[in-house]
From Swiss-Prot:
UniProt protein name: Glutamate-1-semialdehyde 2,1-aminomutase
Gene: hemL
Pfam families: Aminotran_3 (PF00202)
Organism: Pyrobaculum neutrophilum (strain DSM 2338 / JCM 9278 / NBRC 100436 / V24Sta)
GO BP terms: protoporphyrinogen IX biosynthetic process
Modified positions (N6-(pyridoxal phosphate)lysine) in chain numbering: 258
Family: Belongs to the class-III pyridoxal-phosphate-dependent aminotransferase family. HemL subfamily.
Length: 424
């Protein structure tokens, strides 16, 4: 069995914890992907994980394949400046006005790590504020639990994170203006930056109030701190200008990833020119990497951005998410479940609960047991949903109306079977 072999060479048998799918007998094994479909050891599945949001055009999109193939013909790494990376950066800058200059790295984790380092270097301050339920990668600066005030700041969420590192990170309730303002006052003149997912997509899907996003901008400006929007998930998915375009708020720094790499490893941190000019070699904040602005990732990313500029991919993907959100709520209600579906652009998530979802606590209070059972049954009926209520579902330009209707029919079977298993 492949999983047994995998456990002999990988911790837990996988190379990222979310792939473990512990509620299943064994993880899914992928054999290929095309359009909206994953091909797995459980058969063909309509994919709504989409590589945790990295794929927006559909798997193995022809334009991306062609761009990558052309790059491979010319070689795949030079560790030198290329015309393609400049053209790519110019396209990013054209759509995200807050990014005046940028550095192209290799992952969202690298992007946020360097953005935090840069903010500290620019402001010459050391404390950052992040939010409960927001995920910014797997580096030490941000692996911090939520607390209830200054006395409880600095509790790590991972073994191996030094106390001296994470005591400089304060965690504040998400979508809570009063708690945020209080935290800014408590930190005072030590505050270097506030880092936030402007739409939280790594703890389910939480769409904050506009007043909250507005307060982030106002309070950081008042405090002389930088505002960092982590748009690794939302960048070029919510639209060409991301969540910052949706809310009409201009951060000082932005991080991007996922969609802008077309499924290849990439990360970007960028923002105000005066801040970015602090990055080496023009300034004292160090960043370097053999694989920075990797030609293959840049080629794939540029192909995706150019395709998105047509507008049609967004129209198809967003309509699919809207139809799924309405359809799932309708099916769940008819079968006899209390379900809330949150949706924006081509992202959606469903929760077994009554009442809205506005905070991470609302997500925690939803019935995770039912979600995991539904996830397993959906696979049985040919649909791969996000593997936890703490993740987000994504649609793509390959999720046509026919695919959506097939999905809803399959989910009706899954909900009905779930009802027969759990009863009233």
């Amino acid at each position: 069995m492949l999983f047994e072999r995998a456990r002999g060479v990988f911790p837990g048998g996988v190379n990222s914890p979310a792939r473990a799918l512990k509620h299943l007998a064994a993880p899914l094994v992928a054999n290929g992907a095309s359009g909206p479909y994953l091909y797995t050891d459980r058969g063909r599945l309509v994919d709504y994980c989409m590589a945790f949001g990295a794929i927006i055009l559909g798997h193995a999109h022809p334009r991306v394949k062609n761009a990558v193939a052309k790059q491979l013909e010319r070689g795949w790494i030079y560790a030198l400046l290329t015309e393609e990376e400049v053209a790519y950066a110019e396209r990013i800058k054209a759509h995200v006005p807050s990014i005046e200059k940028m550095r192209i790295v290799n992952s969202g984790t690298e992007a946020t790590m360097n953005a935090v380092r840069l903010a500290r270097g620019y402001t010459r301050r050391d404390v950052i504020i992040k939010f409960d339920g927001n995920f910014h990668g797997s580096h030490d600066y941000v692996l911090v639990k939520a607390g209830s005030g200054a006395a409880t700041w600095g509790v790590p969420t991972s073994a191996g994170v030094p106390q001296d590192v994470i005591k400089l990170t304060a965690v504040v309730p998400y979508n809570d203006v009063d708690a945020f303002v209080k935290a800014v006052r408590e930190v005072g003149g030590r505050l270097a930056a506030v880092i936030v997912e402007p739409i939280a997509a790594n703890y389910g899907l939480i769409i904050p109030d506009r007043e909250f996003i507005k307060a982030l901008r106002e309070e950081t400006e008042r405090a002389g701190a930088l505002l960092i929007f982590d748009e690794v998930v939302t960048g070029f998915r919510v639209g060409l200008s991301g969540a910052q375009g949706h809310f009409g708020v201009r951060p000082d720094l932005t991080t991007l990833g996922k969609v802008v790499g077309g499924g290849f490893p990439i990360g970007i941190f960028g923002g105000r020119a005066d801040v970015m000019d602090m990055v080496a070699p023009s300034g004292p904040v160090y960043n370097a990497g053999t694989y920075n602005a990797h030609p293959v990732s840049v080629a794939a990313g540029l192909a995706v951005v150019e395709e998105l500029e047509r507008g049609e991919p967004y129209k198809i993907a967003n309509e699919a998410a809207e139809r799924l959100a309405r359809g799932i709520e309708d099916i769940a209600g008819r079968v006899g479940f209390d379900v809330v579906v949150k949706q924006i652009a081509s992202m959606f998530q469903l929760y077994f609960r009554r009442g809205d979802v506005k905070t991470p606590q609302d997500v925690r209070e939803s019935d995770e047991r039912l979600y995991l059972k539904l996830h397993e049954l959906a696979i049985k009926h040919g649909v791969y949903l996000a593997p936890s209520q703490y993740e987000t579902n994504f649609t793509s330009a390959a999720h046509t109306r026919d695919v959506v209707e097939t999905t809803l029919a399959a989910l009706e079977k899954a909900f009905t079977e779930l009802k027969s298993q759990v009863g009233k």
